Design a protein with these regions (language model features):
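Short, well-formed alpha-helical segments that are part of the catalytic scaffolds
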Residues: 14-28
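Short beta-strand/loop segment that forms part of the nucleotide-sugar
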Residues: 33-43, 65-67, 95
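Glycine-rich, basic loop-to-helix element that forms the pyrophosphate-binding segment
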Residues: 67-85
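Donor-binding/catalytic cores of nucleotide-activated saccharide
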Residues: 77-78, 95-209, 214-232
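Membrane-interface aromatic/basic loop that binds lipid-linked glycans or pyrophosphate carriers
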Residues: 275-345
Length: 345
């Protein structure tokens, strides 16, 4: 059967959420018979596979791909899903999130009408039940089509961190296969690398600022281990940054937006490390940044970063400890998250 869209869901121990995710695909107004659903289980140890198999018994268009060993990161299962996709268009979904019922109809119609390489929609952020709109851009336009490499302004506009997640988008599969685009399997920032490789190989990217088609859930204590803060995550994140920086080295445009936003994320991870790990991590940050001229707009992050670049490592670690205290205060953390997201809505 020829499907309009292949949907890829990476799964690891998602028994509490996977049914809701799958149901959001089954209920699409484009018609579930037009969808190929590929679920890649990353060696779950709970009953996620049993839940998926129960859906499989009812629907012929659900494929379950079982990895024999847990990869620890979502890159491998997503790339494996691409290998199994048979339709001309690909959509990604995280196992603890959902799509709005009309999402695929809107995305599919848009990519055909605009002849886009990929389409990006706006999304909701579910902050423990508080639904916040996350806008792509501050604009009154309902649809914007851009050539990513046309000029610096356009590239900067498309380089913001809130755009890089693979979900909330529809991709022309030919873009991915022709350019051998896959997710790195040994690092974090794998979605950033994938996004930018799609971006620099695209001639036409379409944004739907007024269409909120995806719900990103941020339930406290429910997100996977990649949302923790330890030296392994720090190293994996830095490795992913290096991969993407190397990918973009020949585009003849500034990559300051990518660098500044990801350095900010790296410094937040750094701030939550233990004392001995911080002593090692601060040197790695310095080595990565010492020959770069990165402008960081967030003042508190810029202050911390400047101490590192001046090799005032003890002071940088002290300041990071203060940031860690504030970040891990539940009241302050939730207030900041909600304020920051509402400010951009």
């Amino acid at each position: 059967m020829n499907f309009k869209i292949s949907v890829i869901i990476p799964v690891y121990n998602a028994k509490d959420d996977i049914s809701q995710a799958i149901d959001s695909i089954i209920n699409q107004t484009i018609g579930f018979d037009n969808i190929e659903l590929i679920v890649v289980d990353d060696a779950s140890t709970d009953n996620s596979k049993d839940i998926i198999k129960s859906y499989q018994s009812k629907y012929d268009n659900i494929k379950l791909i079982e990895l024999s060993q847990n990869s620890g990161l979502p890159g491998k299962p997503r790339s494996k899903g691409i290998d199994y996709a048979t339709s001309d268009y690909i959509v990604f979904l995280d196992s603890d999130d959902i799509y709005e019922n009309d999402a695929f109809e809107i995305l599919y119609d848009t990519i055909l009408k605009e002849n886009s390489d990929f389409v990006i929609s706006s999304h909701y952020i579910n902050l423990d039940g508080d639904m916040v709109k996350a806008n792509l851009l501050s604009t009154d336009e309902e649809l914007i089509s851009l050539n990513p490499l046309k000029n610096q302004e356009t590239f900067d506009k498309l380089s913001c961190n809130h755009l890089v997640a693979p979900w909330g988008k529809i991709y022309r599969k030919e873009l991915i296969t022709k350019n051998n685009i896959r997710f790195p399997e040994d690092s974090l920032c794998e979605d950033t690398y994938f996004y930018f490789k799609c971006l620099i190989n695209s001639n036409n990217v379409t944004l739907l600022p007024k269409n909120y088609l995806y719900v990103y859930n941020t339930f406290e204590n429910r997100k996977t281990a990649i949302h923790g803060h330890d030296m392994k995550k720090f190293n994996n994140f830095l490795k992913g940054m290096i991969y993407t920086k190397d990918l973009l080295k020949d585009i003849n445009l500034s990559i300051n937006v990518f660098l500044s936003e990801n350095i900010s994320s790296l410094l937040l991870i750094f701030s939550n490390l233990n004392k001995s790990d911080k002593k090692r991590a601060v040197l790695k940050i310095y080595d990565f940044e010492k020959d770069l001229d990165i402008l960081i707009p967030r003042k508190e992050i810029s202050i911390l970063n400047n101490f590192i670049l001046k090799k005032q490592f003890k002071l940088a670690i002290f300041i990071s400890n203060c940031y860690s205290f504030l970040y891990n205060n539940k009241f302050i953390k939730n207030f900041y998250r909600k304020f920051n997201n509402k400010k951009n809505s």
